[in-house]
Swiss-Prot record:
GO terms for biological process: D-xylose catabolic process. This is Probable NAD(P)H-dependent D-xylose reductase xyl1. The keyword NAD applies. It comes from Aspergillus clavatus (strain ATCC 1007 / CBS 513.65 / DSM 816 / NCTC 3887 / NRRL 1 / QM 1276 / 107). The active site is at Y50 (proton donor). PANTHER family: ALDO/KETO REDUCTASE. Belongs to the aldo/keto reductase family.
Length: 330
C-alpha cells in the first residue's frame, strides 16, 4: 500500500501519511518501525527528544537488509532539540543523530521548538530534555536566525535534503522568511479538530510550506501524560460528529480524522502497533469527505492546545520561582 505525496519547495516529494515515533517504547521501537515498513509506511517522524533513534535505525536497517526497501524509498525526519540551537552545535548533533539512525542524510531536519536552551553535552545526558544539569530551565541567548543559518549549512553539506520548523507561530514564520537563504520546507504543528489553527495553516501553505499535523487524535495522545485538559475533554473518537461521518463512509473515526487533514493537504503522522490499524491509518486517501463534513469537523475547534510542555512536565512552579512569572511557550 502506498500513499500520495506532497511536493516540497525543496523539490522533494514527502508522503502525506507517515509513522510518528513520539512515545514509541525503546523495547519495541525497532520491531514497530520494521513492521510499519512492511505495511507500506515510508515516512518516519523522529526526534532527538524521543530518545529512540538508535532503535528506529535498527528497524530501518533490518528492512533494508531484507530487501523490503532501499534507503531512497524512505523519508526519514528528525529534529534539532532546544539544547543545540547554538550555531556551532547544530552540525555535530545532526551527525550524531544520523549515526544513531545509521543513515547518511535526513530527508527532513526540523527545528523542534523556537526555544533555545542552555547546551547540555550529550556525553552527560542524552536526550537532554527541558532541564539543565541543575534541574532548572535555563535559556540560551541564541536567536533563531543564527540557528537557521546553521540549519542551511546542513543542506549545503548534504546532511539534510530539506529543513523545516515545528511549533512556530505565524509571526515567527514571517520573520524567518524575511532572511532565510534556504526556505523552510515544512511546518509541523499540533493540529486536530479541537485545535485547527486555520489561519496559521493557510498562511504557511500560502508561503509554500507543507504542513504536517501531529497529535491528530487530539486528547488521546496526552491521556497517559496525566494532562488535566486531556482527561476533561471528550475523545474525538467518540464525538457524535465524527462517529456519524465514520459510519456514513464505512470508516473508523481515526480514518475520518486523518482524512480531514490529508484532504486539505495536511500531512499526518499517526502510529500504532496493531497491524489492522496500521493499514487503516495508511489508507486515508482512498475516500473523500464532503465539503460540509469537513466544515462540521472544523467547527469543533476550541483553540485547545494539549502540547504545552510547561504543563506536561510540571515545572511551571519552578519557573514562577525562578522568574516571578509564567513563561509561556505558545
Amino acid at each position: 500500500m502506498s500513499t500520495p505525496t506532497v511536493k516540497l519547495n525543496s523539490g522533494y516529494e514527502m508522503p502525506l501519511v507517515g509513522f510518528g515515533l513520539w512515545k514509541v517504547n525503546n523495547d519495541t521501537c525497532a520491531d514497530q518501525v520494521y513492521e510499519a515498513i512492511k505495511a507500506g509506511y515510508r515516512l518516519f517522524d523522529g526526534a532527538c527528544d524521543y530518545g529512540n533513534e538508535v532503535e528506529c535505525g535498527q528497524g530501518v536497517a533490518r528492512a533494508i537488509k531484507e530487501g523490503i526497501v532501499k534507503r531512497e524509498d524512505l523519508f526519514i525526519v528528525s529534529k534539532l532539540w532546544n539544547s543545540f540551537h547554538d550555531s556551532e552545535r547544530v552540525e555535530p548533533i545532526c551527525r550524531k543523530q544520523l549515526a544513531d539512525w545509521g543513515v547518511d542524510y535526513f530527508d527532513l531536519y526540523i527545528v523542534h521548538f523556537p526555544i533555545a536552551l542552555k547546551y547540555v553535552d550529550p556525553a552527560v545526558r542524552y536526550p537532554p530534555g527541558w532541564m539543565s544539569e541543575n534541574d532548572k530551565l535555563e535559556f540560551s541567548n541564541t536567536p533563531i536566525h543564527e540557528t537557521w543559518a546553521a540549519m542551511e549549512k546542513l543542506v549545503d553539506l548534504k546532511l539534510a535534503r530539506s529543513i523545516g520548523v515545528s511549533n512556530f507561530s505565524a509571526q515567527l514564520l514571517m520573520d524567518l522568511l524575511r532572511y532565510a537563504r534556504v526556505r523552510p520546507s515544512t511546518l509541523q504543528i499540533e493540529h486536530h479538530p479541537y485545535l485547527t489553527q486555520k489561519r496559521l495553516v493557510d498562511y504557511a501553505q500560502k508561503e509554500g510550506l507543507a504542513v504536517t499535523a501531529y497529535s491528530s487524535f487530539g486528547p488521546l495522545s496526552f491521556l497517559e501524560l496525566n494532562l488535566k485538559d486531556a482527561h476533561e475533554t471528550p475523545l474525538l473518537f467518540e464525538h457524535p460528529a465524527i462517529t456519524a461521518i465514520a459510519e456514513k463512509h464505512g470508516k473508523t473515526p481515526a480514518q475520518v480524522l486523518l482524512r480531514w487533514a490529508t484532504q486539505r493537504k495536511v500531512a499526518v503522522i499517526p502510529k500504532s502497533n496493531n497491524p489492522t490499524r496500521l493499514a487503516q491509518n495508511l489508507d486515508v486517501t482512498s475516500f473523500n469527505l464532503e465539503a460540509s463534513e469537513i466544515e462540521s469537523i472544523s467547527a469543533l475547534d476550541r483553540n485547545l492546545r494539549f502540547n504545552d510542555p510547561l504543563a506536561i512536565t510540571n515545572f511551571v512552579s519552578s519557573l514562577c520561582a525562578q522568574y516571578g512569572f509564567y513563561a509561556p511557550i505558545f
